[in-house]
Amino acid sequence: MDQGRTSANHWHLPATQALRREAHFDSRVVPCFAVRPAGLATMMRQAALHHPHAEALVDGEQRWNWQQLQDASLRVAHGLRHLGVNPGDRVALLMGNRAEFVLALYGIAQLGAVAVPMSTRDSAKGVGFILNQCGARAVIAQADMAGLLPARLDDGTPLVQVLCSHAAGSDAPTTKPSTPWENLLDAVPARALHDETKEAEEAEEAEEAEEAEEAEEAPAIIVYTSGTTGQPKGAVITHFNVVHSTLHYQTCLGLAAGERAVLAVPGSHVTGIIAIVATMGAVAGCVIILREFKAAAFLQLATRERMSYTLMVPAMYALCLREPGFAALDLSAWRLGGFGGAPMPVSTIEQLGQHCPGVRLFNAYGATETTSPATITPPGSLTLDAVGVAVPCADIRIMDDDGREVPPGQSGEVWIGGPMVVPRYWDNPQATALSFCGGYWKSGDIGTLDTDGFLRIHDRKKDMINRGGYKVFSVEVENCLMGHPRVLEAAAVGVPCPVLGERVHVFVHASADGVPGEALAEELKNLCRRDLADYKVPDAISFTASPLPRNANGKLLKRELRERLLSADGAKRSG
């Protein structure tokens, strides 16, 4: 399929951001930004060259400008090389949001190795699976995570371990050989760093176009999809992918030097890496670390550091609005607020507009396989049901079950093509063949495109409910329920029914003002009866005291919710 269609007309690209079609990844022809950096390390070097004294990174009381960040990341690269890590080797990162994550990410890129971020919430089994599946040569981890790390991979290969202090008195002792983070940074004298930086810049200027293109397609990061089913798969994000996604954020949002972005979502997740860390490198902005999201801590940090840009899931915005004193805060520097992973309730949009009128809210739809954004809502077009239009180089098509494109307005599976789509999963040709076709990633989402190019997501293919022969898109039910002021989160799932095939069961996480019970359940059903077809009205509603389960991308884990119902049903039967 020729990936020639783009939505550049929605974005009014400047002349400096012209597009051209190029062949990449085994002759796949895609629209590309004609002028672009070669990769992650090049973006950082350009930021240090043109904005050496601009603030680049803030973590508590620690601050780095771009020259200091480049020096520190070069130390990381030299230290890893001293430990036996070579270009192309995989280096895992097992740590939360902290400065070392950013320094390590750029250091790994400087070395030409491949970063493999992992979640600190994973189990020893999950961590071991990723380390072995990617064939990691080294891991940089918080010291309190050392207990999750094997000394060797399953094939007997030793695993180089670098440990960062977590907090005073909290580091668990380890008997495995490891290198302290501070020793990694001291592996080479400062003079040698500056000499090598100069040599690298001269070599980069002399590099042939063919070599630069080959480097573009080299893996930069492997992000494992937490997935909603099955074993995680390692999406191979190349430098080519990273560069185009950061340019999409920069172009569509009007980002520029001096932006100040709070990293509120996990840095190990594709949104944190691409939308915040890498994009701030592309524009010479500043990454402000929030180690753990608490609404009060986020608002305090955003106010103190004059935050201009962030991305969060809708529930995080709702928690901020509920924080006492929110309306009195000086958030006047905040101008861009992105969200994804779930619909933004109308009440949240309205309250943010009232208290922060200078903030442009935007929906960013994408996935690990699309290196973050595939669509973004243009200015002035935010609606409850649409996730935006394709970013400039993206090609989005709606396909039927036979792989044929359907007309505008007709629902089908969302296929996404473009230079930000990863070429494969790491060492998993079977999963690659199932999920990719002709350069397009098959999202598994059911959606529609209208004649203006706006994409609407109706459901996951596997989450659509068949109630007595009628199709119920769970997202439609959830959006309706989110219109109630007490509903913080809602998830509709299909449960087996001997008569109808499936019935509609909804899980609701409600606000704390009042005890949820039969009265609220009836209110919610009446809301659905008013706004939805009768067969879409929930048959049952369960209230949860804690937030609904989500993966690292903020997407609901409906499999876990179904398992809760099946377990409860099994307990009833056995009782």
Question: What are the language-model segments listed below?
Answer:
Residues 2-17, 34-56, 71, 571-573:
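A short N-terminal helical cap/helix-turn-helix that marks the beginning
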Residues 22, 147-216, 569-570:
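ANL superfamily adenylate-forming
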Residues 243-260, 268-308, 323:
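Conserved AMP-binding/adenylation subdomain of ANL enzymes
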Residues 35-36, 45, 53-98, 102-106, ...:
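Conserved AMP-binding/adenylate-forming core of the ANL superfamily
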Residues 90, 96-116, 120-124, 129-138, ...:
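A short helix-loop-beta submotif of the ANL/AMP-binding
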Residues 65-67, 220-244, 377:
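Conserved AMP-binding A3 loop
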Residues 307-312, 321-383, 395:
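Gly/Ser/Thr-rich phosphate-binding loop
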Residues 122, 139-141, 310, 418, ...:
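AMP-binding/adenylate-forming catalytic core of the ANL superfamily
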